[in-house]
Amino acid sequence: MLIVVSPAKTLDYESPLVISRFTQPQLLDHSAELITRARQLSPDQIASLMKISDKLAGLNAARFAQWQHDFHPDNARQALLAFKGDVYTGLAVEDFSDGDFDFAQAHLRMLSGLYGVLRPLDLMMPYRLEMGTRLDNSRGKDLYQFWGDVITQHINAALTAQGDEVLINLASDEYFKSVRPKALKGRIVTPVFKDEKNGQFKIISFYAKKARGMMARHIIKHRLTEVEQLTGFNVDGYYFVPEESDAHTLMFKRAEN
């Protein structure tokens, strides 16, 4: 069973590391090609393309300029420790054991606009390049065309290495669009999290993102390897709803307090 999650815009390169081991990203040649293209953008162009402030655009122009192919602990950080956002609040890796990191390294992948696919211990330099960014490049008009089948092939290889064929989709729509279902050698299962508001259950982005992280943590902490085991997820008030679930969707709901 392989889990995919989205990255986060917010990064943390300051907090003490809870693990010193690291690995190298596996798609750096592709990343370097994107960096070469991104370096052609002025801060004003970055601000317009990414719809961010001038200050953030300047920061990311500097990050593109400083990026280098040689990753080491002095200029990079393990991806699972670098990302900070709602999903990663739910993952809460601060108390992960060595065994937890080992299981995560085998079963968790982070999709990325710049790095394609990252394993938890893969080093990454700071960046901002969301998968939905319409950055024209040598392979097409946006990052989906740039990555093409590369991400899907990489996921297929990871599934084959596990001897498994189940992909647990805990990523956002923006990022999961980089995976091509028809080329995927496996079954996609998507947990959905709905919260009650004013008597109606709906997907509330902030809560859903955190819940995806909590589900990933639950799988890692309990070493789950079968889809059926996910139905036991009952963290933070969520409960499984079998009548709204099927072979491809697992529905979880949480009642209003």
From Swiss-Prot:
Pfam families: H2O2_YaaD. One of its GO terms (biological process) is response to hydroperoxide. It comes from Aeromonas salmonicida (strain A449). One of its GO terms (cellular component) is cytosol. This is UPF0246 protein ASA_3634. NCBIfam families: PRK02101.1-1, PRK02101.1-3. Belongs to the UPF0246 family.
